[in-house]
Swiss-Prot record:
Modifications after synthesis and translation: Light-induced changes in cyclic nucleotide levels modulate the phosphorylation of this protein by cAMP kinase.
GO cellular component labels: cytosol; nucleus; photoreceptor inner segment; photoreceptor outer segment
UniProt-annotated stretches for the region Disordered: 1-67
Localization annotation: Cytoplasm, Cytosol; Nucleus; Cell projection, Cilium, Photoreceptor outer segment; Photoreceptor inner segment
Gene: PDC
Source species of the chain: Equus caballus (Horse)
Keyword Membrane included in the entry's annotation: no
Protein name: Phosducin
Domain of life: Eukaryota
Phylogenetic placement of the source organism: Eukaryota, Metazoa, Chordata, Craniata, Vertebrata
Subcellular location, principal: cytoplasm
Xref: Pfam families: Phosducin
Residue numbers bearing the Phosphoserine modification: S73
Biased composition (Basic and acidic residues): 58-67
Length: 245
């Protein structure tokens, strides 16, 4: 029904078109639009503007043309201003949708700091009882071993940026398997998921420069696909894409 009415209006418009060229077609359409609208539903001020837009003044009527130009300028400003408001609303809506999406995807537990494991039993319990979707990064260290302090500091920063990843640390002497983690293989990183060891890095400090920081450790773990996408980074990227648009 609606499609038939729209087609009929288009045919009527084609029959009433009297101008040629882009400006003539636009003026014909404005005039037809005004006539086809319910007169009671159009505010008087809008109706007057539509009339003026559909019936440009003659070049000899200087005063009328100036008045028309002023009204057109105001109308154009309002339209542009409204378009900008619409764009801002759309950006806010898309940003909110992205935030909602990340919240829905981030339905697992959140941590945000490095857990100190005191015993081997606590170590095993953490691996076995944590949710299967959670990635667990365990740093096995000892005081005084080169690279251990820097790695602990780096993991503390990463824990804040990746709250869905559980970062832990435990002294080799507290694991109950100190003979397996001698000083020459420290610091060691073990990565678990779903109760299974998925990556292990012995003497991991050798992968970095003499001085290394959180960004270096982050890049290293990302090379092996062990970290999820940072939530803050994803939202910033979305905001940048919206600004480009």
């Amino acid at each position: 029904m609606e499609e038939a009415r729209r087609q009929s209006l288009e045919e009527d418009f084609e029959g009433q078109a009297t101008h040629t060229g882009p400006k003539g077609v636009i003026n014909d359409w404005r005039k037809f639009k005004l006539e086809s609208e319910d007169s009671d539903s159009i505010p008087p001020c809008k109706k007057e503007i539509l009339k003026q837009m559909s019936s440009p003044q003659s070049r000899d009527d200087k005063d009328s043309k100036e008045r028309f130009s002023r009204k057109m300028s105001i109308q154009e400003y309002e339209l542009i201003h409204q378009d900008k408001e619409d764009e801002n609303c759309l950006r806010k809506y898309r940003r909110q949708c992205m935030q909602d999406m990340h919240q829905k995807l981030s339905f697992g537990p959140r941590y945000g700091f490095v857990y100190e494991l005191e015993t081997g039993e606590q170590f095993l319990e953490t691996i076995e009882k944590e949710q299967k979707i959670t990635t667990i990064v365990v740093h096995i260290y000892e005081d005084g071993i080169k690279g251990c302090d820097a790695l602990n500091s780096s993991l503390a920063c990463l824990a804040a940026e990746y709250p869905m990843v559980k970062f832990c640390k435990i002294k080799a002497s507290n694991t109950g398997a100190g003979d397996r983690f001698s000083s020459d293989v420290l610091p060691t990183l073990l990565v678990y998921k779903g109760g299974e060891l998925i990556s292990n890095f012995l003497s991991v400090a050798e992968q970095f420069a003499e001085e290394f920081f959180a960004g270096d450790v982050e890049s290293f773990l990302n090379e092996y696909g062990l970290l999820p996408e940072r939530e803050i980074h994803a939202l910033e990227q979305t905001s940048m894409e919206e600004d480009v648009e």
